[in-house]
């Protein structure tokens, strides 16, 4: 009974520490950021899983580092650099995926590496102390400022409006692009629009878990949801809810045990995915 009692006591202590931490603005910002990002991941991540666009999403995430390098080198907000650069690279990768379907993996891999290389070189060439470079790679949810929460909320609204306007069209190109073509839908333009939405979501998620682990938070909740629901709106709702749970649990564990928040969130999500596979079988 003693190990169980110690475990219960440790859990109570962790909960008390989290309740106390909620008094501070940085923790409140972290919770709000988790909710906003989880919503975006559930909505866009579902289409990533349905369309099997995980590799493109990973390429966009890593290529965004080139935009961060541009921001440092030319002395403007690296986040805006990541937005613009990832959007351009996403459209390029989407065009490659549509035009060169047989060789797209290789070409996307080259663009992935190119973006990272540009970012690393520009940061190396930048003079002065670069304090927060690591936060873009590994995430720093506890340092998200309040003004960026408004940016995240705006991006969430943009994604919701986009899906409201083009939901049926996105479904058509996801499940039967040939039928979509016969219905005179602009399949290529719709595909590039979806890729652009992925780029915007990547930059949002980057602030929580970092570029290295962005793709996990985008795909794991949706992949779990896809095993148990077949309706896309339900998949989006479940994926968003799971993302919120993973972020909340990961944030609590990282704060209690002084661990990296981004890595802890992804660890929680990965364990949940493995458990879901076991139950599925």
Swiss-Prot record:
CDD domains documented for this protein: TM_ABC_iron-siderophores_like
Gene Ontology terms describing biological process: response to zinc ion; transmembrane transport
Coiled coil: none
Keyword Iron-sulfur attributed: no
Chief site of localization: membrane
GO CC annotation, single: plasma membrane
Membrane-crossing segments per the record: 30-50, 54-74, 76-96, 106-126, 153-173, 198-218, 235-255, 259-279
Membrane topology field: Multi-pass membrane protein
Keywords, sorted A to Z: Cell membrane, Membrane, Transmembrane, Transmembrane helix, Transport
A Pfam family recorded for this sequence: ABC-3
Compartment(s): Cell membrane
InterPro entries named among the record's database cross-references: ABC_BtuC-like, ABC_TroCD
Family, per entry: Belongs to the ABC-3 integral membrane protein family.
PANTHER family for this protein: ABC-TRANSPORTER METAL-BINDING PROTEIN (PTHR30477), METAL TRANSPORT SYSTEM MEMBRANE PROTEIN CT_417-RELATED (PTHR30477:SF18)
Protein's name in the database: Uncharacterized membrane protein slr2045
Species whose genome carries this gene: Synechocystis sp. (strain ATCC 27184 / PCC 6803 / Kazusa)
């Amino acid at each position: 009974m003693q190990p169980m009692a110690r475990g219960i006591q440790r859990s109570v202590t962790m909960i008390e520490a989290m309740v106390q931490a909620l008094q501070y603005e940085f923790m409140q910002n972290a919770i709000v950021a988790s909710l906003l990002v989880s919503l975006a991941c559930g909505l866009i991540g579902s289409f990533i899983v349905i369309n099997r666009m995980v590799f493109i999403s990973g390429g966009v995430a890593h290529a965004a580092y080139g935009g961060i390098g541009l921001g440092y080198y030319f002395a403007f907000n690296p986040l805006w650099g990541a937005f613009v650069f990832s959007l351009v690279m996403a459209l390029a990768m989407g065009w490659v995926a549509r035009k060169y379907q047989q060789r797209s993996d290789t070409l996307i891999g080259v663009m992935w590496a190119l973006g990272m290389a540009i970012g690393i070189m520009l940061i190396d060439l930048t003079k002065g102390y670069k304090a927060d470079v690591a936060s873009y790679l590994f995430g720093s949810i506890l340092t998200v400022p309040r003004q960026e929460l408004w940016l995240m909320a705006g991006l969430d609204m943009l994604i919701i409006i986009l899906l409201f306007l083009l939901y049926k069209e996105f479904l058509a190109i996801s499940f039967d692009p040939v039928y979509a073509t016969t219905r005179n839908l602009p399949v290529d333009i719709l595909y590039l629009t979806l890729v652009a939405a992925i780029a915007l979501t990547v930059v949002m998620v980057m602030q929580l878990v970092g570029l290295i682990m962005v793709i996990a938070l985008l795909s794991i909740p949706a992949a779990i949801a896809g095993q148990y629901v077949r309706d896309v709106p339900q998949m989006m709702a479940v994926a968003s809810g799971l993302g919120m749970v993973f972020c909340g649990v990961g944030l609590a564990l990282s704060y209690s045990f002084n661990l990296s928040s981004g890595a802890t969130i992804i660890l929680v999500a990965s364990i949940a995915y493995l458990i879901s596979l076991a139950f599925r079988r």
